[in-house]
């Protein structure tokens, strides 16, 4: 059964059942349906290229863990929650890298002058 209509994609129970069964067409339909919205959502916190990476990572995670998806959970809600958390993790990671870089610059500044 392919999911070609918006109505089909929004039928959470059907989508989860198809994903659990390993339906690649269903996954691709979900990917296409949610991609832009998820990228836009993630770009609230990170640049668009980073947002696109986060969305790809999220969709890969969903596919790799499809057998653990539960029909009672909203796929849309899950996707947006994962994207938000990954975006905030990326910000946190960037801050740590920036802080370490600044500390190293201060520590070794005299050696390079």
Specify the residue positions occupied by each region the protein language model found.
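Extreme N-terminal regulatory/targeting segments of RNA polymerase sigma factors
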Residues: 1-17
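Short, charged helix-capping/linker segments at alpha-helix termini
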Residues: 3-5, 20-28, 39-57
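Internal acidic/polar
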Residues: 8-12, 89, 97-113
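Alpha-helical structural segments
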Residues: 29-33, 107
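ATP/adenylate-binding site constellation spanning eukaryotic-like Ser/Thr protein kinases
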Residues: 32-36, 56, 84, 93
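Structural recognition of an alpha-helix C-terminal capping motif at a helix-to-coil junction
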Residues: 40, 53-60, 64, 73-85
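Arg/Lys-rich amphipathic alpha helix in sigma70-family domain 2
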Residues: 67-70, 81-102
């Amino acid at each position: 059964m392919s999911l070609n209509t918006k109505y089909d994609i929004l039928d959470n129970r059907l989508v989860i059942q198809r994903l659990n069964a390993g339906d690649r067409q269903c996954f691709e339909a979900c990917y296409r349906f949610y991609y832009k919205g998820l990228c836009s959502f993630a770009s609230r916190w990170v640049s668009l290229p980073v947002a696109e990476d986060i969305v790809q990572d999220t969709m890969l995670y969903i596919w790799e863990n499809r057998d653990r998806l539960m029909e009672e959970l909203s796929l849309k809600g899950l996707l947006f929650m994962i994207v938000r958390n990954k975006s905030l993790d990326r910000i946190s990671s960037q801050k740590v890298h920036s802080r370490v870089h600044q500390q190293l610059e201060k520590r070794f500044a005299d050696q390079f002058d």
